[in-house]
Amino acid sequence: MAMYDDEFDTKASDLTFSPWVEVENWKDVTTRLRAIKFALQADRDKIPGVLSDLKTNCPYSAFKRFPDKSLYSVLSKEAVIAVAQIQSASGFKRRADEKNAVSGLVSVTPTQISQSASSSAATPVGLATVKPPRESDSAFQEDTFSYAKFDDASTAFHKALAYLEGLSLRPTYRRKFEKDMNVKWGGSGSAPSGAPAGGSSGSAPPTSGSSGSGAAPTPPPNP
């Protein structure tokens, strides 16, 4: 099985636990976040779906070669925190939105009033008087607190997004990654230790006419 060599067990192995992003995927997600109108609940509801499209898995392992023809970058701890802040801010909902009513006001359904009664100065039966909320009302205080939270959530969202958009990624690709990490990809193709380079064992056979002993040949006897 093909795999990286022993040098992988140092720095390259440690980085497999870090979040990685593919550069084009990163640009797409941040562009879509920039189009979000945070003041609109419908747009805030889109944020979790946008963030779910951000892929942060490590693109390589000891048995999986770094991708070719793609640029990847490691995300810093600060970038991960900024993404988490955007996710958290997206969960904000105004209390008035949750109640589907304006805090402190009474929903009124007036009864049918005859044309003659409408000219009377008295308050018609069935028509409730709408009073503005008082500062001492608990509902008013809840709504004030809710809007303060909205300001905090909006600020957190825009600051985190500005940080991510200004982030200087350090993209890398296969050749650069393997050079920087000093790793090589392949199987165990090297010859065993002690084996000759030519792949043969023993000494070379003697040439023709040679005894192989290194001594001069014995002359023929005299007749």
UniProtKB/Swiss-Prot annotation:
GO terms for cellular component: viral capsid. It is found in: Virion. Pfam families: TMV_coat. The keyword Amino-acid biosynthesis does not apply. It comes from the Viruses. Transmembrane segments: none annotated. GO terms for molecular function: structural molecule activity. Gene3D superfamilies: Tobacco mosaic virus-like, coat protein. InterPro entries: TMV-like_coat, TMV-like_coat_sf. Keywords: Capsid protein, Virion. Residues 202-216 have a biased composition (Low complexity). Residues 117-136, 181-223 are annotated as: Disordered. This is Coat protein. It comes from Tobacco rattle virus (strain CAM).
